[in-house]
Regions:
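Hydrophobic, aromatic-enriched interface-forming segments
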Residues: 1-2
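ATP/Mg2+ or Mg2+-diphosphate-binding catalytic cores
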Residues: 87-107
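Hydrophobic alpha-helical segments that form the core
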Residues: 77-85
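Generic structural signal for hydrophobic core residues of well-folded globular domains
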Residues: 47-48, 84, 88
């Protein structure tokens, strides 16, 4: 199996750094959701894909609240594959090559 079996979680669905707003008061706001049920590693992979600042703090807090399965970091590329393919279709550029790199371990 590619990912550990667990019940679907409520996902933001479009959780990239542009949809994470950092308030002056230290609070964080998540905007523009495309909410759906899915594997909870997916939102974390999206944050990593587009370089969220303080990602290590975010993933540590997430894991503290709800521990992630062993090896979740190894599956980040798998969860990034779909958005990379979408971006390759929409924007071209290097997204197709990045999608191929993400898919290579699973070919």
């Amino acid at each position: 199996d590619l990912v550990p079996e667990e019940p679907p979680a409520r996902l933001h669905g479009d959780l990239w750094n542009g949809n994470v707003l950092w308030g002056h008061d230290g609070r964080v706001w998540l905007v523009d959701p495309a909410a759906h049920g899915g594997h909870r590693e997916t939102d974390l992979a999206m944050l990593a894909l587009f370089g969220l600042p303080h990602l290590a703090r975010v993933t540590a807090a997430y894991a503290e609240a709800s521990p992630l399965a062993d090896g979740w970091q190894d599956r980040v590329g798998l969860h990034q594959l779909h958005p990379l393919l979408v971006h390759a279709c929409l924007f071209g550029g290097g997204y197709a090559a990045r999608a191929a790199e993400a898919a290579a371990p699973y070919a």
